[in-house]
Amino acid sequence: MPSEILLKIFSYLDAVSLLCAGCVSRRFYHLANDNFIWIRIYSTAFSPTRSNWKVNSVEKIAVSVSFLSVQDKEAGYWKKEYITKQIASVKAALADILKPVNPYTGLPVKTKEALRMFGLGWAIILKEKSGKEYIMEHVDLSVNDTSVTVIWYGKNWPCLASLSTLDLCGVTPVFMDWYKTPTKHRLRWHSLIAKYNLSHLTVSTMIGCDRLIRIFCLHPGLLVGVWKKEEELAFVMANLHFHHLVERSTLGSATIPYELPPHSPFLDDSPEYGLHGYQLHVDLHSGGVFYLCGTFRNLFTKKGNIENGHVKLIVIHLKNNREHLPLIGKVGLSWKTDILDGCIKSCSMMDVTLLDEHGKPFWCFSSPVCMRSPATPADGPSFLGQTYSVDYVDAEGRVHVELVWIRETEEYLIVNLVLYLSIAKINRWFGTEY
């Protein structure tokens, strides 16, 4: 068919159909880049009248000049301009929906709505040592109170021994309504969230196992399940905290993560500024089942509790029985693949949201954790039952939990919960010099 006829046909297509047509063949690709077609699509989608603007003479002249200069632009110029504008409009809409903040959690009120409305998803990119890549979109996810758990599984995993790294990316449709009708060739952009080294699947990172699989925890917040018998991948599970999740999943590039905006300290002349007024919300959960959901307000500490670059913030005191909390149900981390499922005892996901005295998120994370034995409470009361501990550590702080298994009631009891906050982070956040 003559190119003139094809161009005439293409001129009746919308942007999505035109992009799909460009994937058919090399000839169609070049024809679908026609600037005259794309400037019409661009002008219709982003015209001043469409945005309820008042069109003045300067704008009219600018539009006319744009049409006259079409031939001066390289092929595909107006297609790129249109896609760039679409991406910018999606980002602007995301920023707008995330403005309202929940005073209880310090997090955006409409995070769940944003995930749904904008078709946000996640993908992992498995890279072989040879350079070959495998892109896998998430199979399942569950939205929790302050995090989302994303799962990948299937039958076509590449050989684990050949893999070097795993990239976790947010995936967003360029056109906001595309996610409603999924297609293999839909136009999307990737935002790198984290990069993991798969050579770190060692004994030191293994946190649990059952008769079928072993699970490994890679920082930040990634859980990798490996079949015991075959020593191959069974599943990958990422637990992502809501704090800046949408921004991290949409505003980065395929190779560079989104960089958080610089924090401006709230200055205060209080002698112990930055050591009081904290609020902690902590969840322990797995598979939609919550073992703990607790909020602790008005937490404080003293300068005398600063040691080894951290300040000790006691949330649950070991010697105060009234503060001790039970975990609800049988603690275990649920997993599944396309053919099997199971539950690994004593493991779960931990979500921590620590707000400063102004109600701003100071330290947030979501990560797999496990209870380890033995861990005898120091200088504490004599408990009847096995003792356990849960520990998490990163560059900004450490969480230490001590638990006791009560045989009579068959439940775990939290008898001590302590946060160790980085003094360097406190000084940066509050402008102090501890």
From Swiss-Prot:
Keywords annotated in UniProt: Ubl conjugation pathway
Keyword DNA-binding attributed: no
Domain called F-box: residue spans: 1-41
InterPro entries (alphabetical): F-box-like_dom_sf (IPR036047), F-box_dom (IPR001810)
Signal peptide bounds: none
GO cellular component, one term: SCF ubiquitin ligase complex
SMART domains, per database record: FBOX (SM00256)
PROSITE patterns: FBOX
Domain of life the protein comes from: Eukaryota
Record text on subunit structure and interactions: Directly interacts with SKP1 and CUL1.
Role, per record: Substrate-recognition component of the SCF (SKP1-CUL1-F-box protein)-type E3 ubiquitin ligase complex.
Name of the protein in question: F-box only protein 15
Gene from which this protein is expressed: FBXO15
